[in-house]
Amino acid sequence: MSISLFSSTPSVAVLDNRGLLVRELQYHRHPDTPEETDERITCHQHDERGSLSQSADPRLHAAGLTNFTYLNSLTGAVLQSVSADAGTSLVLSDAAGRAFLVVTGAGTEDAVTRTWQYEDDTLPGRPLSITEQVTGEAAQITERFVYAGNTDAEKMLNLAGQCVSHYDTAGLVQTNSIALSGVPLAVTRQLLPDTAEANWVGEDASAWNDLLDGETFFTQTHADATGAVLGITDAKGNLQRVAYDVAGLLSGSWLTLKDGTEQVIVASLTYSAAGQKLREEHGNGVVTTYVYEPETQRLTGIKTERPSGHVAGAKVLQDLRYAYDPVGNVLSVNNDAEETRFWRNQKVVPENTYIYDSLYQLVSATGREMANAGQQGNSLPSATAPLPTDSSAYTNYTRTYRYDRGGNLTQMRHSAPATNNNYTTDITVSDRSNRAVLSTLAEVPSDVDMLFSAGGHQKHLQPGQALVWTPRGELQKVTPVVRDGGADDSESYRYDASSQRIIKTGTQQTGNNVQTQRVQYLPGLELRSTKAGNTETEGLQVITVGEAGRTQVRGLHWESGKPAEISNNQLRWSYDNLIGSSNLELDGDGNIISMEEYYPYGGTAVWTARSAVEADYKTIRYSGKERDATGLDYYGYRYYQSWSGRWLSADPAGTIDGLNLFRMVRNNPVTLMDNDGLVPYPRTRRPNSNLHEPKIDTEKDRDIPGQSKGPHLKNMTVRSFAGTPVSLYSALGDNVLHREALLTDLINKSKAAMDSETTSILENKEGGILAFNAIKLSNNTGDVFNALHIVNKKTTEFQQGPGAVRAYWAPQGGYVDIPVHPHGGEPELVFTPGFSGCVFVADKLSENTIRVRHVEGNKEDAQYNDESIDHGLGMIEAMEYKHYGYYTDENGIVIENITGSAFMRYEREAGSDRPGKWKIKYQAIENASNILSIQELRSGFINKKIELTQK
């Protein structure tokens, strides 16, 4: 790696006089032309209230275009979003801040309008239904919510007031029992017939039930008192069981197939003090060990082996060694378990190397591929079976990549001289957006946008292969083969309310018959069937083990049509690499079933198996995702086309990964991975997860090198401010937080009157729920602040103002548990005291619960890092001292600031009805003011003044 390529290429953020980001400068250099530097400027504009109104990347800005244009409300909420990639969306909320109306593809024939209906004012205001209407078609009620009452029977099952029947786009989900911790213990799923559409009209639930298929699927969950899941019994009676150590980390897991004996999946695990896995021993006797770089804790080694004494004999099966550059980009991967081979005067080393440009985009990669490999497309090459032993199996390849100024991959060039496997894949990018297709679909940039829907969904996979999408932007059908006068080959999909795939059906013409392959996805279970005409030829249960350490374990149980070459109830252990790709498959005896290697952006470079039949049952491949018959990789919220290195549709999470909504993992697919099709993550997070290891900085690690202490202001003045109660959300908008400090001084019984119930919650280390509003403070010199204020029995009518909003409270040095996805009127905010050296951090305790902690300064180890503290599945997000405790002055000097404020808010993406995410919002407050007291002064009319100390 040439260090000079990266020298003098900083990322620069330019702020206006309001402190708002208006320019982002990056400097691009390519290793082939290091003497050439391209300054790339991303431009942003804000309206008079400080809300973002326009954003343009370097490529579109140069053409006088924008990536995004926003119309914002007075509170800073986005009402209209016009995206070059994803089209126009309209979002309206009701007076309570709830979703009311969303229009996607607005202004086009593809427009879809969704509206929400709620309970009336005499009830908690929970959602009752969602109505969906495609332009020119009749409206359909696509979701219904039915809630439990308050009977003794319902209370016994903890169902009172809970949504117990959710009629969604796939059918019906019924919750039959809930633990005190909020974990659903018993859930039943019924499906609509494959050809039926969801339309839950009328008010008669029995009529809705008549629309459903007769078969029901019951899943039972076993949890402890803390909400940790101890086991799952799937819809076919297979039991998965897990155990945890005293730190709450996985210590073992087991699987019992129905009517079978319990089998060990994970026999033991060893962790470091930081919670990182050091060693795993699996039920097949195979051991995987992990090595980390001491300074950075980056994973540098993954070794999988049959140890000495194993019944199949000792053998190193995979030994991956990673090397990184200083910022964490992967430079090379060696598999020391594989031999160096020689063929046609070339040395074929089991090694991959990578080169990056100054923006850390991958520009060159080398590796090995099968000697019979051809040009990569959407078809899967045949596996070499049995496992090869000669040196003619592999040859060297080089791939180079080119990108435009908007981050679009425009060309991939492949070279394997020894086999003459040389080709170039060109990608045509629109001149008005970041939409792009293979040049075989369009050669002229102005033609590209016609191949996408208004919402940014690609209409054709390959020439002649049409794509159909649901009104919610989910891929509904792919037609790989179209026949005149005959049945087409197709693959179709159905999704649940959270846009997760629940059914996949593929049809293929074979001679005079139609073969149908169907997959139904249930918790911990896939039901796969094959039919020839109307006759079932195969029925297969695939049990997907949820807790198997870093591996993925799948059990294959045939109910009918078992291949003679495979034993029934076969367990397959899949061992991955840094980004989760399935490299190595082993059976229950620790023997190799298959081995697979991938090109950087996906696609199979090497694939060998001990039998072709066993190879056919491998479905999990690149990045640990399922590969469909279409060649697409299914990630959860999107589909990925590896042959062009692009997503098939615009990012439903919006600009969470930048202005380019089609770019794959920032064009760095070796270092970063995407868990569900929304945002890339470094693989330093917990394996098979988008969660961090639970560790926050302590002592000197909290500091920024070269910082200076801020001035100590001895002179303080006491001034009076006029205060007016305002809507809480008006003080929490991003544009408001940019310019007005949010103070928490009034959340103090010595400064504001509060009742005993409120005081007990404030002092409870496990937090609770309180009602809040905000008070806007101003004086005649133009100073403006906002202060959080608790509304309780002692709050005067005037101070209550426009009302209150319920929110969770996380006390200093304590925590509060909140739902991953609030529903049924649960709060969507978390407040906590102000910060002066403290840390705000959120852990995912279970699939349903998040624990939010306010960790006190200099107590990081005792209150968070200690091994005895329960972190559940791992850290979601943290606001540490580095984030708010420093600022850069006009001379570029980093000054220690000390104080800040923070809260959490559950946010849904504008224009989407998908579940949202909790996000931490915080301020760094320079020379923060302190509120001394609050009092109401009456002089002919009621007003209020707040006295505060201003440094």
Question: What is the meaning of each model-derived region?
Answer:
Residues 1-42, 47-48, 216-218, 224-228:
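Thioester-forming pentapeptide GCGEQ
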Residues 202, 563-636:
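A motif-centric feature for acidic-aromatic and gly/ser/thr-rich catalytic loops and repeats
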Residues 694-707, 867-951:
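Active-site or metal-binding loop neighborhoods of secreted/extracellular toxin and effector enzymes
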Residues 675-738, 742-744, 950-951:
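Low-complexity, glycine/serine/proline-rich disordered segments
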Residues 817-895:
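Catalytic toxin/effector domains delivered as secreted proteins or via bacterial secretion systems
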Residues 741-794:
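Polybasic, low-complexity association/targeting segments
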Residues 591-607, 616, 631-632, 637-638, ...:
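Short turn/helix-capping motifs enriched in Asx and small/polar residues
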Residues 7, 30-31, 38, 60-70, ...:
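Acidic/glycine-rich beta-solenoid
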